[in-house]
Amino acid sequence: MEILAFAIYFVLMLGIGVWFFFKGKDETGEQEYFLGGRSMGPWVTAMSAQASDMSAWLLMGLPGSMLAFGLGKAWIGIGLGIGTILNWLITAKRLRKLSKAANDSITLPQYLTNRFAAKNPALKIVCAIVFLISFTIYVASAFSAGTKVFTSLFPALDPTFAMIIFAAIILIYTFLGGYKAVCWTDFFQGLLMLVALLSIPLFSVVIITRVSAVLDSSMITQTVIGADGTAYNFVTSFFSADPKDIISGLAWGLGYFGMPHILVRFMSIEKPSMVKKSSIVAIIWVILSLVSVVLVAYFGRILVLRNGQS
């Protein structure tokens, strides 16, 4: 069943790339390839932005962190939620208008150069270096997460081979279909992520079978020994978190204003007037997803206790 599910998923991703390859044969030019001709609708813009942002860390990193260290780590999710909302409300519409006005810029380095009338390539070079270093780490972590999913479902699969498959599929649909293929694959991935995150807490309640067990008071007082050897109260650590940990968690949201893979979505939406609808979709998505992740960690901890683990 797992093999069939992955096969269908990969065929869908590659199919999107092939579709836009043939559909876009008559649509030439850099703007078409890198921004989809600035023709993306509000739903695709919203879902692709959120899926490309909250990928492996949302499904694995954040719930795993809360499961291991307590709900005090939920402050990271709150910071990211606030950052997402502010990014859509403050940056999105302005960037769409200004990138068009700045000589119809199609990349962020080009936009910054045109916006500030830079006479030398220094700004572009600095941007390129920052992007190269940051995205090498970011993409490596995404590939690592994808590989872990593969190998957890198929233990006999060599991790290196799994990573090659994962990377090859992404490269194929990206080179074939360009920006539109990337956005549409992210759109479907965003839907899949939301359905999964909403479903897991519901199935967890069914597995636990009793509401009284779900609200078991022992969860309030349970102590978790983190990977660093520190003792955490699983639930109340959210309220008793150290101020510096709260500030650190909330500060994660500041990164949104400089994430190229999100900002480029703002630049590609068809009309500035569509940003409002797109922002509503994105904000609802991120709130539902982050709340669901907290529930996943909470129910996961209950199931761990039921199995006699710590």
Identify the function of each model-found stretch.
Residues M1-M60, T174-G177, L202:
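Membrane-interface "cap" regions at the ends of multi-pass membrane proteins
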Residues G37-S39, V44, G61-L62, L67-I78, ...:
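Loop-to-helix junctions at membrane interfaces in multi-pass transport proteins
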Residues F22-K25, S52-A56, S99-N103, F135-F143, ...:
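Short helix-coil transition sites and intra-membrane helix breaks within transmembrane domains
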Residues G15-F34, G72-G77, I106-Y111, T136-V139, ...:
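Hydrophobic alpha-helical transmembrane segments
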Residues L67-L176, R265-S310:
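Helix-loop-helix junctions that connect adjacent transmembrane helices in secondary transporters/permeases
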Residues M1-M13, K73-N87, D242-A251:
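Alpha-helical transmembrane segments
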Residues I8-W19, S52-G61, G81-R94, A167-F175, ...:
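Central hydrophobic cores of alpha-helical transmembrane segments in multi-pass inner-membrane proteins
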